[in-house]
């Protein structure tokens, strides 16, 4: 043994060698916990919270009130989750739960109360796997990353339209109007400060301040004398409160008539009304955090003594304020040791008015702020220049709306920035972004629905004269809730069809984060800055995994350890470090805002047995940069080397040796790996494979601890001595992507199991570890040009031994309808169908399970009534004799689609007679499931885990494959030119380590960023008796000659991807045409043709291939008459007709007609613009045949001997044209 390693156990008894440095790493959490916790929050907190916001519902006349009894909420979900989900999938239903609630109706006149429990809603319920079953399909609701409510200050922001720079502050609520204060900082003139509500026109900031009761003096007193403020005061002409309110009213309410009541209510209704303007707890938290004193008074000098309530001087004038001191001052304001100042000189009528409307006794708190006078620098202190007022909001506020203290603090901060106090915010930082999880998204839908219920209820009450007849049930209609959820799950961008190819893809789709969707960004306008990786993403969002293409950087994935806190911010775990000692006893979860001024070391730092950091100097992360600091200055250490990356990226061994672009492709392609017939765990793993298998919904964990008493392919029974627990296995199920879901038991009768232990292997799982591909012997060498441009050469052995064979399940459905013309009939007697196509049908006309069917075979026999149009003479006679029409039947059977042949594995019949819920007019629906066994073929896409992808170009006989000195043929030959420019060296390291693993009959684990070092691999070469270079002598299988140079050969983990040639290969001989253009349709699904486009036309034009071009653009395309004539003429052996007008020309003419332009084609119109007749020089009188015969003999005709040609000048006549 050459190097110290630990043997770590993974999955079910797999030992792997671990050579990493990391001392103690946090165990990976259950990856689906955040999703499940969020839904749980919705059930227990979100729904009651929504009720509190809408109820009580009070009638317009105030006589009737309907309130919600707290604690009465009851959620009723199906008893057996497995059976309910299975039924929902087969029958195309939604797996849902019922919500019951007790509502109280109160008559204000006589105080009479009536209580009633009602079924409020039935909405989709989350499965244990974090998904929803909607109409039989499994869907996931992805989390959304959006701007956090609160306040965001920005300096020198470039305007999109012009090249001007602006300072601005955005006040963002969760519900309500966005507000903005801004002014231009470029240009020669000092700009006035403006204010904007939503997308309305700009209003002078002074108008807004005046409208909430400020005078010029108060404005100067609080916000200083900056040039911008003085310019704003100088230019502002409206003096009275009413004039300013009127200006704002005209801009915001536009065409509404101005009334006294409207003016009074204007600002309170926009800002202070909780139902119209809501910051939520997150917004209030952000406001209080941003609008405190700390950021602005740090590194300044006090310009006055700070005195306590007891008149004791706490901080003297002239004191230099460090960040620590600033925190102390803020703390003293928080606990009111230093008194807050009352806001003076503000007209309180607006607030009195609001108090009158909302009865909000806390309103008067709004009049207090914390004020500190400071000098920005030493120079201004020595010169005793005018100090700057720093105003912070009341630190103890908890209102969900804006308050006057907030407005004053925001405006103060805005002007403080001009004096270089405070700091501007980064909108792309995770400090200013939050996650809206599934629970909150569902709560939003629930709130919208409750608002509709409130409106409908009030309307219903107002129409009834006798209120005593109304019951709670008759007033509250739950339809809006059902419709709202149905709409959300079926059409929202955030409700997505689950990626179910393999367990990794499934896990990644549940942990996806999108910046798109309602309230998010637009992919067409999103700038580079928004898409880029940000330093705050560390440990929260993966910097690697994101789609290629237009969604890059907008769709992201959570990192392995990230969680979401109560405010919706992503938090990540760390161990605390004090005086070089790491405290492993407690995990600290930090949000991005809490990382300011702290230093973080990586998990791979060497630590001794006493948990003391060994190196004296460390590279640490601090305030968005990397520094080398003393070990004593480290505050925190990462909990794991996988902390930075997502699950998919963490599954790439030697990720640190790959270029990020290729790592991105590698993590995306692993999610597309097809589950193979026999799964095989990788020789070189990263350690996350076991966690993925353990937490994946496609694998089954024991619900209880106990003894296994029964095992078969469909169920496992565990008995704990009290009650046996049945665990149902998924058996030959179709996934969303048509791959196979099959669970195989890994326990035997008599085994003892613990709760939470894996008891089966699902798809792409091997002994409790994720197994997406196969370990195959790979050589990096060129071979007769067959692996040019990333093509892959594979051995026939991989095909024969079913190494890369996968099973795919196609579903075909047929409906039996009842129409006026008659009913569809299920039958085995199908008119004009061949005996071969009916071979597999039973007596009823349904295919027998187990049949091997091929393209065109009938799966379900169905005949439908023919339409009544144009009856034949015979049909008329029959109708006359029998008094009714003899209904003719046409064959409308379900046949195997092109390329979808295979083995029939299941037949599912849904019928209205059996109580199944089918769409209107459908009496029966039959589903046929066909399984295909797909071996690897030329054209299939394969990939490694490092972004090294390619297409199979040739399958060679084993004897032709290059072989090693001992005669072992390689399985795959890859092109070595695919490595240097792509810079994914990880694949080479994996190749060598795989060879070592095979020789030593062991397996390795090499976690990302804590992997096996190259020096260790070299030492392992000695142990395994492998040449130091890792290269071997290779021989050509065809010539038997040795290759000129040694070749890198080893075991690499290769995947077969979902992009298979069977799904893509397509040819058309005859097929459907588009009705409008009369051109063949496009695409495989429609049996379409290959488009001969504009550029292909240019190519033929450039060669002058007129005949080819003519027939391509007419007969073979959209010349209807021409192609029909052509068909007839080919059959009858006639001449090819002349090409007519293509239909697309008529489409163009119709298009122009819609624009009032008449386009006509005139063939040989005999008049010119002046109305004179035009003679066609070729339209000459017919020449008698004897003249032509003479011409043919001696080559001349004396045309002027003929009367008709007397006027013609012989010299100008082209005789060849005349006689042709």
Curated annotation (Swiss-Prot):
The keyword Iron does not apply. It is an enzyme of class 2 (transferase). It holds the Pfam family RNA_pol_Rpb2_6. It catalyses: RNA(n) + a ribonucleoside 5'-triphosphate = RNA(n+1) + diphosphate. InterPro entries: DNA-dir_RNA_pol_bsu_ext_1_sf (IPR042107), DNA-dir_RNA_pol_bsu_external_1 (IPR019462), DNA-dir_RNA_pol_su2 (IPR015712), DNA-dir_RNAP_su2_dom (IPR007120), DNA-dir_RNAP_su2_hyb_sf (IPR037033), RNA_pol_bsu_bac (IPR010243), RNA_pol_bsu_CS (IPR007121), RNA_pol_bsu_protrusion (IPR007644). Signal peptide: none annotated. DNA-dependent RNA polymerase catalyzes the transcription of DNA into RNA using the four ribonucleoside triphosphates as substrates. This is DNA-directed RNA polymerase subunit beta. The gene is rpoB.
């Amino acid at each position: 043994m050459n190097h110290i390693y630990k043997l770590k156990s993974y999955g079910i008894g797999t030992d792997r060698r671990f050579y990493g440095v990391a001392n103690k790493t946090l165990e990976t959490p259950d990856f689906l916990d955040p999703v499940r916790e969020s839904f749980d929050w919705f059930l227990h907190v979100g729904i009651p919270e929504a009720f509190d916001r809408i109820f009580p519902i009070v009638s317009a006349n105030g006589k009737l009130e309907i309130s919600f009894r707290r604690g009465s909420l009851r959620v009723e979900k199906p008893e057996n989750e497995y059976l309910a989900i299975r039924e929902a999938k087969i029958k195309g239903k939604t797996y849902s739960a019922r919500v019951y609630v007790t509502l109280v109706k109160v008559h204000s006149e006589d105080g009479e109360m009536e209580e009633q429990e009602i079924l409020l809603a039935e909405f989709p319920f989350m499965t244990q796997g974090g998904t929803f079953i909607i109409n039989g399909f499994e869907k996931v609701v992805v989390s959304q990353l959006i701007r956090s409510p609160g306040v965001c200050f920005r300096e020198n922001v470039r305007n999109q339209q012009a090249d001007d720079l602006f300072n601005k502050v955005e006040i963002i609520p969760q519900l309500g109007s966005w507000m903005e204060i801004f002014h231009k900082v470029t240009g020669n003139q000092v700009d006035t400060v403006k204010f904007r509500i939503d997308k309305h026109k700009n209003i002078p900031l002074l108008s807004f301040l005046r409208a909430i009761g400020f005078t010029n003096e108060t404005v100067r007193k609080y916000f200083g004398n900056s040039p911008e403020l003085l310019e704003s005061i100088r230019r502002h002409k409206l003096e009275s409160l009413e004039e300013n309110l009127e200006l704002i009213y005209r801009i915001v309410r536009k065409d509404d008539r101005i009334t006294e009541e409207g003016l009074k209510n204007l600002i309170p209704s926009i800002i202070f009304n909780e139902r119209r303007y809501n910051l939520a707890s997150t917004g209030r938290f952000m406001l209080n955090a941003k609008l405190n004193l700390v950021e602005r008074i740090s590194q300044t000098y006090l310009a006055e003594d700070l005195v306590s309530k007891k008149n004791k001087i706490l901080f003297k004038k002239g004191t230099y304020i460090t960040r620590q001191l600033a925190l102390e001052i803020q703390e003293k304001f928080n606990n009111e040791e230093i008194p807050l100042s009352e806001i003076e000189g503000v007209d309180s009528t607006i607030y009195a008015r609001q108090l009158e409307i909302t009865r909000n006794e806390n309103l008067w708190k709004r009049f207090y702020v914390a004020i500190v006078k400071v000098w920005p620098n030493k120079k201004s202190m020595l010169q005793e220049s005018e100090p700057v007022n720093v105003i912070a909001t009341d630190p103890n506020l908890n209102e969900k709306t804006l308050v006057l203290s907030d407005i004053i603090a925001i405006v103060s901060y805005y002007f403080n920035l001009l004096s270089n106090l405070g700091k501007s915010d980064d909108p792309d930082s995770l400090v200013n972004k939050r996650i809206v999880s599934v629970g909150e998204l569902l709560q939003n839908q629930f709130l919208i629905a409750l608002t509709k219920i409130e409106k409908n209820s009030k309307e219903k009450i107002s129409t009834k004269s006798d209120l005593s007849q109304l019951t709670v049930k008759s007033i509250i209609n739950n339809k809006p809730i059902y419709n709202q959820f149905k709409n959300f799950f079926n059409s929202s961008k955030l409700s997505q069809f689950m990626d179910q190819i393999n367990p990794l893809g499934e896990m990644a789709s549940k942990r996806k984060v999108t910046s798109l969707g309602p309230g998010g960004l637009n992919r067409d306008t999103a700038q580079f800055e928004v898409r880029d990786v940000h330093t705050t993403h560390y440990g929260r969002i993966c910097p690697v995994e994101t789609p290629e293409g237009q969604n890059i950087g907008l769709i992201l994935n959570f990192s392995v350890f990230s969680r979401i806190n109560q405010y919706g911010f992503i938090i990540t775990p760390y161990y605390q470090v004090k005086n070089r000692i790491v405290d492993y006893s407690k995990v600290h979860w930090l949000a991005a805002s809490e990382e300011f001024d702290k230093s973080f070391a990586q998990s791979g730092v060497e630590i001794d047995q006493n948990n003391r950091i060994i190196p004296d100097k460390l590279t640490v992360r601090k305030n968005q940069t990397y520094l080398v600091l003393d070990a004593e200055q480290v505050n925190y250490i990462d909990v794991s080397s996988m902390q930075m990356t997502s699950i998919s990226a963490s599954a790439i061994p030697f990720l640190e040796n790959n270029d990020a672009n290729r790592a991105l492709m590698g993590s995306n392609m692993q999610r597309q790996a097809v589950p193979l017939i026999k799964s095989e765990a990788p020789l070189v793993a990263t350690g996350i494979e076991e966690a993925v298998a353990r937490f994946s919904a496609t694998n089954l964990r024991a619900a209880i601890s106990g003894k296994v008493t029964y095992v078969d392919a469909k169920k496992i029974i565990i008995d704990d001595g009290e009650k046996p627990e049945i665990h149902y296995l998924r058996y030959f199920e179709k996934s969303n992507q048509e791959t196979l879901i099959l669970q195989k038991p890994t326990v035997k009768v008599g085994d003892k199991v613990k709760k939470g232990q894996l008891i089966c292997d699902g798809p792409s799982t091997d002994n409790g570890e994720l197994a997406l591909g196969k370990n195959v012997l790979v050589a990096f060498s060129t071979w007769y040009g067959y692996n040019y441009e990333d093509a892959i050469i594979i051995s026939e052995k991989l095909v024969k031994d079913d190494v890369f064979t996968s099973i795919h399940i196609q579903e075909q459905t047929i409906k039996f309808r009842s129409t006026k013309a008659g009913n569809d009939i299920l039958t085995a007697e199908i008119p004009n169908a061949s005996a071969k196509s009916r071979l597999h049908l039973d007596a009823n006309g349904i295919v027998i399970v187990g049949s091997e069917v091929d393209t065109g075979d009938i799966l379900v026999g169905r005949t439908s009534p023919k339409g009544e149009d144009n009856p034949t003479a015979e049909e008329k006679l029959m109708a006359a004799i029998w008094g009714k029409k003899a209904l003719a039947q046409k064959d409308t059977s379900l046949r195997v689609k092109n390329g979808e042949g295979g083995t029939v594995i299941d037949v599912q019949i849904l019928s209205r007679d059996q109580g199944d819920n089918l769409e209107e007019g459908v009496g029966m629906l039959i589903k046929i499931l066909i399984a295909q066994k797909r071996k690897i073929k030329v054209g299939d896409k394969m990939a490694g885990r490092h972004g090294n992808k390619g297409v199979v170009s040739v399958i060679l006989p084993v004897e032709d494959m290059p072989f090693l000195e001992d005669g072992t043929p390689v399985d795959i030959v890859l092109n070595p030119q695919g490595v240097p420019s792509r810079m994914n060296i990880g694949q080479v390291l994996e190749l060598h380590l795989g060879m070592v693993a095979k020789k030593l009959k062991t397996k390795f684990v090499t976690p990302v960023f804590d992997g096996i070092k190259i020096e260790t691999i070299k030492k392992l070469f000695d142990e395994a008796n492998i040449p130091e270079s890792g290269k071997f002598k290779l021989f050509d299988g065809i010539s038997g000659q040795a290759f000129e140079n040694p070749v890198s050969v080893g075991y690499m983990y290769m995947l077969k991807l979902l992009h298979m040639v069977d799904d893509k290969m397509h040819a058309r001989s005859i097929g459907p045409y588009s009705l409008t253009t009369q051109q063949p349709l496009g695409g495989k699904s429609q049996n379409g043709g290959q488009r001969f486009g504009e550029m292909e036309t240019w190519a033929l034009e450039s060669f002058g291939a007129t005949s080819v071009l003519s027939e391509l653009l007419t007969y073979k395309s959209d010349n209807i008459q021409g192609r029909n004539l052509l068909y007839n003429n080919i059959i009858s052996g006639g001449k090819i007709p002349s090409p007519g007008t293509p239909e697309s020309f008529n489409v163009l003419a119709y298009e122009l007609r819609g624009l009032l332009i008449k386009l006509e084609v005139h063939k040989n119109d005999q008049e010119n613009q002046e109305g004179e007749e035009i003679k066609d020089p070729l339209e000459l009188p017919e020449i008698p045949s004897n003249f032509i015969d003479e011409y043919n003999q001696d080559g001349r005709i004396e045309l002027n001997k003929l009367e008709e040609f007397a006027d013609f000048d012989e010299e100008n006549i082209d005789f060849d044209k005349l006689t042709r």
